[in-house]
Structures are given as structure tokens and as C-alpha cells.
A protein has these predicted regions:
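Peripheral, non-AAA+ core regions of ATP-driven protein-machinery
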Residues: 2-12, 16-81, 88-94, 101-112, ...
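P-loop (Walker A) phosphate-binding loop of NTP-binding proteins
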Residues: 98, 126
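Conserved RecA-like ASCE P-loop NTPase motor core of nucleic-acid helicases/translocases
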Residues: 121-125
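Divalent metal-dependent catalytic cores for phosphoryl transfer on phosphate-bearing substrates
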Residues: 130
Length: 457
């Protein structure tokens, strides 16, 4: 038996080193090398090689026939949109997200839909027993005979079962709990994650079985394990949201078969995850029309316009240093906006505590929402109500000018569906609008001062 030895792997790029170093010599990242004890290398039952087999031969590109097999629909329109029309046969997909955000719930519901409409699905869990999976399935009202579950962490055994079943979809929950006996290291280590992912990649490509693997995330929000993991897979998805709120967003970070600009929006309810085809209506359902400090903004989630209410509260500070608090909005942008309002508009905010909140637990970082945020702040400061059928859009510069924003007509069309009639937009965008709809009123502004006069006149 080979003597055990200690090696160090970079969690970012997977580089192997015989000694610890503060900085990875390959990728240059700091404090990414972790120690692993290698007791000896066993003879691998499955050679570690690339996709395909040793008999593969090169083929001219025009001679390659495109398979007639269509994408597999999950029957969730929100998920199919993010994936570019459905699951591509033979694709290896990675789903990441914070603990408890709903990753397993989402994939269990997808497994049920695929099992009912396409064929057998194998759900392999290394985190829950079969009894625990059954209890979760009952809560979600899932009871498909074609959905088979296995509670195991031995990837080789799971792949043997998948070979026998030939499922239409394979789910691995999660890659950090899986191990192969050919690598003498703990599950979740860099070498185990890399080798297990490599074997899953070969399996799904050679047998044309789409596979989804769940990945844990670090406290920085990155997928745990080597960065190579994200490079190996075909699709990288992130499931985001605040656990204390019901809304969840499925975002594509990498997609070899479609766009990365699409997003899917869900609501977490008692029966599981429910897709929201019209999230703007849900976000504005409880908006009050009798209170100051409220405005409606339209931000782009990928290429999808979403209307959301923003609220502000401005009170006289009880301390020497005024507080600025932002929930769902960038604090630095808020501080800049307050400085612009004080310098360019003459509002006294140096002795005021300012609190802003984006309703629904969503996070908005788009500059196009600057003007609506500024209007909400002034609304509460002056105790003036913003018209309920008005939407304000525009990026605010340090000089107080209102700059153009992208996809203005797409945003306006989305707001029209919900009954909004008045729009204040940048002058540069106003000149670009081609649709002269007489049922709505659009005004273009050049400065933040002009916008305030239009809203509160």
C-alpha cells in the first residue's frame, strides 16, 4: 500500500502543490490552498479521460448530424425560459444557492413533472434518507411511480443504478456529499468534487442523459469546491432570494445552449414553489395609494422588466450622525442620491435619518431606478403623495441631470399592462419612443429638478 502523503489543492483553479502557499502560483488568488491527505492511489475502474471513448475519431463538421431529439420541457415556463427552451439531452447542469433557499424543493418538483410527461427520473440524495425524501414529497403532493429515489453517497453505485434505469433525468443532491472509492479523500474535497463531476460529465454525454447536480455555496456566495467545477458543466444556475421573503429568482450564469439574460421568478408557498408569470402584479398587489414615500420603479431582471414598489422614510435624526439604511438597494447609490438632492435641489437632508426599502425582498442595483428612488425620498420628506398611476424612470448624474436608460419601450409596455397611465422618463429616451399611444401620458425630463416639479406640481 502506498504511503500517505499531504498535498494542497487550490479551491479556485484546482492546482496541486506539495506545500502550502499563501498565494496560488497558477491563478494568483490568496488563501485558497487547502490540505488533503492522500493515502494512496487505487486502480481506477473508470479511466479519468475526457468525454467520449478511446475509439472516437475526428469527423468533419458538416458531416455531423444534428439529433432530432427535442429539448425536454420541465413544464415550468419560468425554468424553460432560463434554460433556453427546456433541458438539452446530455447536458450537465449545476444549481447553486444558499442553504434553505429551496434548491431541493425546486428539483423535486421538476423531477415530478419530467417523470409524468417524459419518463423515469432518478433522484439521488446524499443529504436525506429515503424516508425524509418521502416526507418532503408528501408535503409537495408528489407521488409519481416513475420518480425513483436513492439515498447514497457512493457515486459509482448511483451511476450503476442509473445505467440500469436509463432515466430521462438524473438529479444529484449534492455534489459535495458524493465520493468515489478510487480517490482516497473525504467527500467534498477538491479532488473528490473534481473526479465525481468528471465522471458525471462522461456518463451524461455518452448516454445522452441530462443531469442536474446541486452545489453548496460559500459565505461569499460562490459554489463550494474548485472553480473548475463551473467550467466543466454546461449550465450554471443560481437560485436566489431572502429566506424571510417568499420570492425566489432563478438566474443563469452560464448556458452553452441559450442566453444568460433570462430569469425565472417563483414564490415559495406551503405547497412548494409556484412560478410567477406576472411577478409585477404580485409585487404591487398590496401597494397603498394613500401614503407618502412610495413610488414605483421598473428594473430589468436580465431582459425582463419588473415593476416593484420602493418605500422611503425620512425622519429627523436623534443623534449627531444621521443614519442611512437601505434594504434591497445599494447603500452607496443612496448616499450619492441624497447628496445630489441636497446640492442640486436644495433639500436639507444632513439632519435627517433616511431609510429605503425595496418591497418583496428583491435586490435592485440598476441605475435606471435612481430617479424613482429620489422621488420616493422627497415624497416622504415633503409628505406629498406620488400619483398612483405614475412610473418614474431615469439614471441621475452627479450634476443632477437625468440620463437615458436601456429598453425604455419594453418597460413602458409592461407598466401599461398593469394600468399605469403617466410616465416620467429621460429626455433622451423620450425622443426615441415611436409608439404614440394616446391612452398614456409620457413626459421627458432633463434634470432631477424638472422631474420633481412634474411629480409634485
Amino acid at each position: 500500500m502506498a504511503k500517505a502523503k499531504s498535498v494542497f489543492f487550490c479551491q479556485n483553479c484546482g492546482t496541486k502543490s506539495s506545500k502550502w502557499m499563501g498565494r496560488c502560483p497558477q491563478c494568483g488568488e490568496w488563501n485558497t490552498l487547502v490540505e488533503e491527505i492522500i493515502k494512496g492511489t487505487k486502480h481506477s475502474r473508470t479511466p479519468s479521460r475526457g468525454v467520449g471513448n478511446q475509439t472516437a475519431k475526428p469527423t468533419a463538421l458538416p458531416d455531423i448530424e444534428i439529433s432530432s431529439i427535442a429539448r425536454v420541457s420541465t413544464t415550468f415556463n419560468e425554468i424553460d425560459r432560463v434554460l433556453g427552451g427546456g433541458i438539452v439531452p446530455g447536458a450537465l447542469m449545476l444549481l447553486g444557492g444558499d442553504p434553505g433557499i429551496g434548491k431541493s424543493t425546486l428539483l423535486l418538483q421538476v423531477s415530478q413533472k419530467v417523470a409524468d410527461t417524459v419518463g423515469a427520473v432518478l433522484y439521488a440524495s446524499g443529504e436525506e434518507s429515503q424516508l425524509q425524501l418521502k416526507l418532503r414529497a408528501e408535503r409537495l403532493h408528489i407521488n409519481s411511480e416513475r420518480l425513483q429515489v436513492i439515498a447514497d453517497t457512493d457515486l459509482d453505485h448511483i451511476l450503476e443504478q442509473a445505467e440500469a434505469i436509463t432515466p430521462s433525468l438524473l438529479v444529484i443532491d449534492s455534489i459535495q456529499t458524493m465520493y468515489t472509492g478510487d480517490i482516497d479523500a473525504a467527500p467534498g474535497s477538491v479532488s473528490q468534487v473534481r473526479e465525481c463531476t468528471s465522471r458525471l460529465l462522461r456518463f451524461c454525454k455518452e448516454r445522452n442523459i441530462p443531469t442536474v447536480i446541486i452545489g453548496h455555496v460559500t459565505k461569499e456566495g460562490n459554489i463550494a469546491g474548485p472553480r473548475m467545477l463551473e467550467h466543466m458543466v454546461d449550465v450554471v444556475l443560481y437560485f436566489e432570494g431572502e429566506r424571510s421573503y417568499q420570492f425566489r429568482i432563478l438566474r443563469s450564469i452560464k448556458n452553452r445552449f441559450g442566453s444568460t439574460s433570462e430569469t425565472g421568478i417563483f414564490a415559495m408557498v406551503e405547497e412548494g414553489l409556484q412560478e410567477l408569470s406576472n411577478p409585477s402584479a404580485s409585487l404591487l398587489a398590496e401597494r397603498s395609494d394613500e401614503e407618502s414615500g412610495s413610488a414605483v420603479m421598473i428594473y430589468l431582471e436580465g431582459v425582463r422588466p419588473i415593476l416593484v414598489e420602493v418605500q422611503s422614510l425620512v425622519v429627523t435624526t436623534a443623534f449627531g450622525m444621521p443614519r442611512r439604511t437601505a434594504i434591497g438597494y445599494d447603500l452607496n447609490r443612496l448616499i450619492v442620491l441624497l447628496a445630489v438632492l441636497e446640492k442640486r435641489c436644495g433639500f436639507t437632508l444632513g439632519n435627517k435619518d433616511v431609510y429605503v426599502n425595496v418591497i418583496g425582498g428583491l435586490k435592485v442595483n440598476e441605475p435606471a431606478c435612481d430617479l424613482s428612488m429620489a422621488v420616493a425620498i422627497v415624497s416622504n420628506l415633503k409628505n406629498r403623495i406620488v400619483p398612483t398611476d405614475m412610473v418614474i424612470l431615469g439614471e441621475v448624474g452627479l450634476t443632477g441631470n437625468v440620463r437615458s436608460i436601456p429598453r425604455i419601450e419594453q418597460r413602458i409596455n409592461e407598466a401599461k399592462k398593469l394600468g399605469f397611465k403617466k410616465f416620467i422618463i429621460p429626455e433622451g429616451n423620450y425622443k426615441q419612443i415611436k409608439d404614440n399611444d394616446s391612452s398614456i401620458k409620457i413626459r421627458g425630463v432633463k434634470s432631477i429638478q424638472e422631474a420633481m416639479q412634474l411629480v409634485f406640481s
